[in-house]
UniProtKB/Swiss-Prot annotation:
ATP binds at V18, G60, V61, G62, K63, T64, E65, D248, E313, R385. GO terms for biological process: protein unfolding; proteolysis involved in protein catabolic process. This is ATP-dependent protease ATPase subunit HslU. SUPFAM superfamilies: P-loop containing nucleoside triphosphate hydrolases. PANTHER family: ATP-DEPENDENT CLP PROTEASE ATP-BINDING SUBUNIT CLPX-LIKE, MITOCHONDRIAL-RELATED (PTHR48102), ATP-DEPENDENT PROTEASE ATPASE SUBUNIT HSLU (PTHR48102:SF3). ATPase subunit of a proteasome-like degradation complex; this subunit has chaperone activity. The binding of ATP and its subsequent hydrolysis by HslU are essential for unfolding of protein substrates subsequently hydrolyzed by HslV. HslU recognizes the N-terminal part of its protein substrates and unfolds these before they are guided to HslV for hydrolysis. It comes from the Bacteria. It comes from Azorhizobium caulinodans (strain ATCC 43989 / DSM 5975 / JCM 20966 / LMG 6465 / NBRC 14845 / NCIMB 13405 / ORS 571). Belongs to the ClpX chaperone family. HslU subfamily. Pfam families: AAA, AAA_2. InterPro entries: AAA+_ATPase, ATP-dep_Clp_protease_ClpX, ATPase_AAA_core, Clp_ATPase_C, HslU, P-loop_NTPase. Its main location: cytoplasm. A double ring-shaped homohexamer of HslV is capped on each side by a ring-shaped HslU homohexamer. The assembly of the HslU/HslV complex is dependent on binding of ATP.
Length: 435
């Protein structure tokens, strides 16, 4: 769990996302409160519950991007899901408890990766011994092994092919649902899980280069040194206390006014979400998981429906409400130039791989922003995503001919941009911009 201060979290988000200060502050405070709760002891620690967040704002203003960046910052089990993917319990489809099962798998992956780093030195030596066994045999003399070990570490044997024994494992085994046992009880059952012990001791021979053998064996040796039971328990603890779920497209499951009749992917899903967000115990194949202290961040554009169309109980379980503002022309210019991996920087880097030096002038950036604003206002406002479409149109010809122009420097100014998107700016052909 990261211990960034709210100011540091906002500063980190500012590197990638323009504007939306209120939303950044809300998620920063929520993330810091996770750390604060960990510092409490005993009864008070159990009593402090997370304040779940509802982010409201038009499409393309940064709701999903905030969640993506937050996941990297959190250092905690984090899962982003679309609310529209779930159906009411009892119907065909995924029920909402699958969210927690998926979150546990994310947690196990995080903890296992950390434990692999902890045992990396020992695993490295064990993997090296297995490569030496493949090169000179298990019964070779220590003198021979030492000589080959030096060559191996010097990289002299990298291109030599060896045959190694690796775990056959049960990966790739099919998944199936047990009839009469819906996901609420156990979820999809993997044959690999059921037959894991039977397959656990099986190995298969593979012929690989020495340089490729070491990474393969390193992961295998690290997993041998890890206590899998302890890993699972640690992961469940991390999920229960630090887990974060980002529920996107929550507006799509709101029951709109004037509609009646059953809809298994709308109100039923909201009802199923209530206990999950309030706090319940979900059965997983790794054991029961309590959701009381999992933080839920919901977001939606609410173009057609309103937040008040959600069930009142669900609204009450999302007490912190943040509205994100629509982006302006000035925001578009900043998105193109100031963010760490802006579209301009990405385009320059991509053309650089072809040996083409791309120079996009400031007035070209202004022109791209102008076109994006104009098309957003006349067709459909899809926010910052419009910039990607305009940028692709501007660079379309160059992207196609770049392999033939290696060594050239291509300058793009406002006139070049207007020439490429002239028909679009005049509303002559907007079909390419309707996503």
């Amino acid at each position: 769990m990261s211990d960034f201060s709210p100011r540091e979290i906002v500063s980190e988000l500012d590197r990638h996302i323009v504007g939306q200060g209120k939303a950044k502050r809300a998620v920063a405070i929520a993330l810091r409160n996770r750390w604060r709760r960990q510092q409490l002891q005993g009864h008070m620690r159990e009593e402090v519950l997370p304040k779940n967040i509802l982010m409201i704002g038009p499409t393309g203003v940064g709701k999903t991007e905030i969640s993506r960046r937050l996941a990297r910052l959190a250092g905690a089990p984090f899962l982003k899901v679309e609310a529209t993917k779930f159906t009411e319990v009892g119907y065909v489809g995924r029920d909402v408890e699958q969210i927690i099962r998926d979150l546990v798998e994310v947690g196990i992956g995080l903890v296992r990766e950390q434990k692999r780093k902890d045992v990396q030195a020992r695993a490295h030596l064990a993997a090296e011994e297995r490569v030496l066994d493949a090169l000179v045999g298990a019964n070779s003399s220590s003198t021979t092994r030492d000589a080959f070990r030096k060559k191996l570490r010097a990289g002299e044997l990298d291109e030599k092919e060896v045959e190694i024994e690796v775990q056959a494992g049960a990966q790739g085994m099919p998944m199936f649902e047990i009839p009469g046992m819906p996901g609420a009880q156990m979820g999809a059952v993997s044959l690999g899980d059921m037959l894991g012990k039977a397959f656990g001791g099986r190995t298969k021979a593979r012929r690989v280069l020495v340089k490729d053998a070491h990474p393969l064996l390193l992961t295998e040796e690290a997993d041998k040194l890890i206590d899998q039971e302890a890993t699972t328990q640690e992961a469940i603890y991390a999920v229960e206390n630090n887990g974060i779920v980002f529920l996107d497209e929550i507006d799509k499951i709101a029951q709109r006014e004037g509609r009646s009749g059953a809809d298994v992917s709308r109100e039923g899903v909201q009802r199923d979400l209530l206990p999950l967000i309030e706090g319940t115990t979900v059965s997983t194949k790794h054991g029961p998981v309590k959701t009381d202290h999992i933080l839920f961040i919901a977001s939606g554009a609410f173009h057609v429906s309103k937040p008040s169309d959600l069930l009142p109980e669900l609204q009450g379980r999302l007490p912190i409400r943040v509205e994100l503002e629509a982006l302006t022309r000035a925001d578009f210019v900043r998105i193109l130039t100031e963010t760490e991996a802006s579209l301009v920087k990405q385009s320059v880097a991509l053309m650089g791989t072809e040996g083409v030096t791309l120079d996009i002038s400031p007035d070209a950036v202004e022109a791209i922003a102008d076109v994006a604003v104009e098309v957003n206002s006349t067709v459909e406002n899809i926010g910052a995503r419009r910039l990607q479409t305009v940028m692709e149109r501007v660079l379309d010809e160059l992207s196609f001919t770049a392999p033939d122009r290696s060594g050239e420097t291509v300058s793009i100014d406002a006139a070049y941009v207007r020439e490429r998107v002239a028909d679009l700016a005049k509303n002559a052909d907007l079909s390419r911009f309707i996503l």
